[in-house]
């Protein structure tokens, strides 16, 4: 497996799973204070364009029915590049990011193949689901199995 990430925590976790025979590539740039991720990328275009991604998982600052947004231009640009080269892009978004547009638009909402979230979508988002634009996967944290006592 080959993984490309800008997240330091992701890279460290993947590094621990040597049994997966994982090769990890880090995108170079400026370390964002307190975020454990690289922003303000330097010459990442050449690296990101070398790969064809089967799956890309990415977070965002917010979404609305028209788009997926990021607070940093550097983060937005790298996510756009990777989404364009991904066979399946998967957006990870928690309940606080719905109906929360931000400064830089990464993509149209419908450009994500799937959205994984921890909240039921509102009626407007449900209409998009019913129209088949995007696949929503709702992970209900209350349904997690509890340890036996």
What is each stretch, according to the model?
Residues 1:
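A short alpha->loop->secondary-structure connector
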Residues 4:
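Short, conserved beta-strand segments within well-ordered enzyme catalytic domains
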Residues 11-149:
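Conserved phosphate- and dinucleotide-binding cores of soluble alpha/beta proteins
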């Amino acid at each position: 497996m080959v993984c490309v990430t800008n997240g330091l925590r992701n890279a460290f976790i993947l590094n621990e799973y040597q049994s997966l025979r994982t090769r990890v590539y880090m995108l170079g740039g400026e370390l964002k204070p307190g975020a454990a991720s690289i922003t303000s990328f330097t010459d990442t275009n050449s690296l990101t364009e070398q790969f064809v991604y089967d799956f890309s998982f990415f977070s965002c600052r917010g979404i609305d029915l028209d788009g997926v947004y990021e607070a940093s231009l550097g983060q937005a640009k790298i996510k756009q590049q990777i989404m364009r080269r991904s066979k399946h892009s998967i957006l990870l978004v928690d309940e606080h990011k719905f109906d929360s547009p931000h400064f830089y638009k990464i993509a149209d909402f419908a450009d994500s193949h799937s959205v994984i979230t921890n909240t039921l979508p509102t009626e407007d988002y449900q209409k998009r689901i019913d129209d088949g634009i995007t696949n929503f996967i709702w992970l209900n944290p209350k349904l997690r199995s509890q340890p036996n006592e």
